[in-house]
Amino acid sequence: MDPKDESAHVWPTSADHEQSTAQVHFVPDAGTVAQIVYTDDQVRPPQQVVYTADGASYTSVDGPEHTLVYIHPVEAAQTLFTDPAQVAYVQQDATAQQVLPSIESVHGSDPLATLQNPIARLDAKEEEEEEEDEDEDTEEEEEEDAEDTDVDDWQPDPPRPFDPHDLWCEECNNAHSSVCPKHGPLHPIPNRPVLTRARASLPLVLYIDRFLGGVFSKRRIPKRTQFGPVEGPLVRGSELKDCYIHLKVSLDKGDRKDRDLHEDLWFELSDETLCNWMMFVRPAQNHLEQNLVAYQYGHHVYYTTIKNVEPKQELKVWYAASYAEFVNQKIHDISEEERKVLREQEKNWPCYECNRRFISSEQLQQHLNSHDEKLDVFTRTRGRGRGRGKRRFGPGRRPGRPPKFIRLEITSENGEKSDDGTQDLLHFPTKEQFDEAEPATLNGLDQPEQASIPIPQLPQETPPSLEQEPETHTLHLQPQQEESLVPTQTTLTADDMRRAKRIRNAALQHLFIRKSFRPFKCLQCGKAFREKDKLDQHLRFHGREGNCPLTCDLCNKGFISSASLESHMKLHSDQKTYSCIFCPESFDRLDLLKDHVAIHVNDGCFTCPTCKKRFPDFIQVKKHVRSFHSEKIYQCTECDKAFCRPDKLRLHMLRHSDRKDFLCSTCGKQFKRKDKLREHMQRMHNPEREAKKADRISRSKTFKPRITSTDYDSFTFKCRLCMMGFRRRGMLVNHLSKRHPDMKIEEVPELTLPIIKPNRDYFCQYCDKNEMSYFALSKKVALYIAFMVKYLTLQVYKSASKRKAHILKNHPGAELPPSIRKLRPAGPGEPDPMLSTHTQLTGTIATPPVCCPHCSKQYSSKTKMVQHIRKKHPEYAQLPNTIHTPLTTAVISATPAVLTTDSATGETVVTTDLLTQAMTELSQTLTTDYRTPQGDYQRIQYIPVSQSASGLQQPQHIQLQVVQVAPATSPHQSQQSTVDVGQLHDPQTYTQHAIQVQHIQVTEPAPAAPSASQVAGQPLSPSAQQVQQGLSPSHIQGSSSTQGQALQQQQNSSVQHTYLPNAWNSFRGYSAVSAGDTSHESASEIQMMTLPPGQFVITDSGVATPVTSGQVKAVTPGHYVLSESQPELEEKQASALSGAVQVQPSAHSDSLDSTGPSQQQTTQYIITTTTNGNGGSEVHITKP
């Protein structure tokens, strides 16, 4: 509301006011406050008008009760206001504030009288206003003109000098001492509150009480639990305060400041921003309430629990014995009363019948036996314990719910206890016995305390078919699938088992005895009670005629309460409240309904009319219908669920609540529902479980090998200490980390092998709709189409995530291909599920394992190892140089290719599928920009080189540590050697490891061609000349010897590298092949032999492979012959032959007879792949 409008109603304007000025008298105090008295009957919201000292501006702000006028003091005693309509005389004293309606009232009468009676003056003024006959439109125009005049008259205040206590107003471009009088207050948005360091560092198991203060426990904290260290600034002893515990710290001279060398330093625990949560722990006043002890360890102070801290118990600390002497304090002495209380607190086995507590379960069992003598019968109630007497419509628990406790065997009829410690259920008398019994005896009112209390049953209301129950019977009421008390291999004796069984039964019985044992039964309605007083109170409701104050007018039946009478009056009304769930009939009494439902029994069971489910009890089928087939009218306000009963809704509302009022006294876990706490106590803290846990801890677990020694050798990954084999690398790594944490990864040779991962191409099935069968066409056309489709049409990705992003971006709404990880094996007659993934296996990738520097875990990539460190070792995640760079290795592809060739022979290609072959053939004419870079490195430890001079010589070992695979170039370009000559060293001692290279072929020129006889008599090895002992260290290193000079003349030799198409496992069992020697017992090797016309043989068997002159003989099964003019790999089936190896020109070439100086001959390499078992064997490298 505009302040001008408000003032017009309070003090109406007049022509006299506009022509004269007005003065406002006030007391030059801290401010003048006056209450405005309204003269009309119009209802207005509360306002307050704030006037500035010079009267130039004002503002209106809503107040809580009424309108206030604030007049700020100035130096003069009077303030001149330019607008008379806004002026009033204000008088302020210590007791009252008065306001005059106008300045003219003071001129025309006694000012003092007016000030003393402002209300009368206001009434007179109101009468004068009523006499004025003015038009409403004219008044509104005058108000608007007055408002415009007020705005035009407002002038901004002169700029004020800077004062930090002034509030800046950007609209006025000036500062004010408080709220801006023109534009009103600002709209503040406060900062979000942030917890202090002390409160934010509080552990999750603790909480700080907002009202009592101190630190309390949320759950049970065991003894010998350490908290800390204490954090806070260190000050001198004179600066300490008495509101917290004083902790002194002993520091070394290097940790002290210069000024504190001879002064004691104490923790100052009063500032929450500098200390941690331990500042809130209050000191203990005596030994009884102390549960923490303070001590110094190293340079820090810690708190340790000296007893079990129960839930909702406050932590209180005092000094340790030695630390108390250091801080000049005394430890708390233990009085005799405190000793008794402590002994009582150690009794953790309470009895719920008499509130006594015991130290051990055996003492509790002995005490429970005294209660068992009084209770010769133990029954249970139906449902969840809301028992209303014995079931009337069939025995048994509701189907689908497990038994709540162990029910015992009933072997006797008289209620006596059996010898094995079990209890017997008392036999219930039949209807005839109930009629003959006396009322007092049946109610149990006159029975002695320790006598057996017979519990009669209500007269049977079911048909004869339901009451056929034998009087003497034996029940075997054991729980379903009862587990054995002890494991199969246990040290418990039979007495221990019987004692554990008695403890279990007694503990379970006394949990439910209050709900199960109801000996006092009403003869009128059959309701049972645990106490006699409850039965007497109930009997008063069964009033008789003339004995009750309330009487029914229709039948003259008496009642004690109006509620009973109101319930009885329903019998005389036409409304029938009890309806049958099986038929349309309804009844006015519940007992009539129970008699009626007996006609719906079929084979002793009740059938649900909706779902045809069968139940042995009418109460069960009634609950089933109400729960599942009735209208759900009780709607949850938090979610969309609805219920048919209000109690179910209340139970459901606990899910939306954070309150957990039921606390487990053993472990401190909290629950929202009482039944969940009860189930938790039975499942987690029963004596049987505790006995199993204690026995499991005491017994050491014996090791049993899972497999026999014969199967142990068949595994790739195995632990030699435990003689166990594993199918995967990760299983071995986990086994070593758990069983052998001190063993290093380097000591296990299996874990140094590279990790083989499949390499796949992921295609987008939506980018090419015209797919065809490439293999149905001719060979060359299929190769060409395959290449064009792969690189020019199809969208190919190296990961499923990139293909998924492509489909979501370019094909929105399209169905994503199924994940390979979630595929299930195809059934009989079903298509292969891999066809729907649109992927193709292109080979395998061998990567070295990336080891975690903080544990024994291994990963195939650095990314996964970094994720592991961040998750499992967060304390090292932020430290620099904690992640080691893995070693680079070669890519073993299923599509091998010779990367480097000589310009005279052309490039040899080894392929495994047509698609890759087409890609390779057509890529020869492309530039290097379209080729896959081959810049990986391979680590090679040992390469035995077999050389021959005049006869067969022993292999000489040369170490090639690193061989770099160079990118493939055009056949017309010159090829540089990719063997690092500097890596061949002098004879040294090396440790043998796994090899990561499969094929190396080094060619060098021969000065003269050998004759046919020489070739026939020599093995597949280099030239026998001494100058061609090619790759000895002295020659390759370029020494000054004659052999070194001869090596310098062989600058035109080329190096050839090839990937083989199989994984590492395919090279097991390879052996060396020597001429005339079939029993060569050496390490597992791969031998590569080169035939003169460019044809070479890869041997993978231990049998010699002779080649006769003029033809290529059949080799052993598994041998592969690859010709220069034959780009595909053909498997030759043959049998092994004996004899010397003879090499003759093949049918594919005639160049053997005429060899020139430029002819080259290949040096034979034998690549060892033997894995050292313990990593300790050594191979000596000697010079040739």
From Swiss-Prot:
InterPro entries: PRDM10_PR/SET, SET_dom, SET_dom_sf, Zinc_finger/UBP_domain, Znf_C2H2_sf, Znf_C2H2_type. Residues 917-1164 are annotated as: C-terminal glutamine-rich region. The modification Phosphoserine is found at residue 418. Gene3D superfamilies: Classic Zinc Finger, SET domain. One of its GO terms (cellular component) is nucleus. One of its GO terms (molecular function) is zinc ion binding. A zinc finger (C2H2-type) spans 349-371, 520-542, 550-572, 578-600, 606-629, 634-656, 662-685, 717-740, 850-873. Disruption phenotype: Embryonic lethality observed during the preimplantation stages. A significant down-regulation of EIF3B transcript seen in embyros and embryonic stem cells (ESCs) and ESCs exhibit severely impaired proliferation and growth failure. Present in brain, liver, kidney, spleen and thymus (at protein level). Residues 1037-1054 have a biased composition (Low complexity). Residues 202-320 form the SET domain. There is a cross-link at residue 374 (Glycyl lysine isopeptide (Lys-Gly) (interchain with G-Cter in SUMO2)). It holds the Pfam family PRDM2_PR. It is found in: Nucleus. The SET domain is degenerated, suggesting that it has lost methyltransferase activity. This is PR domain zinc finger protein 10. The gene is Prdm10.
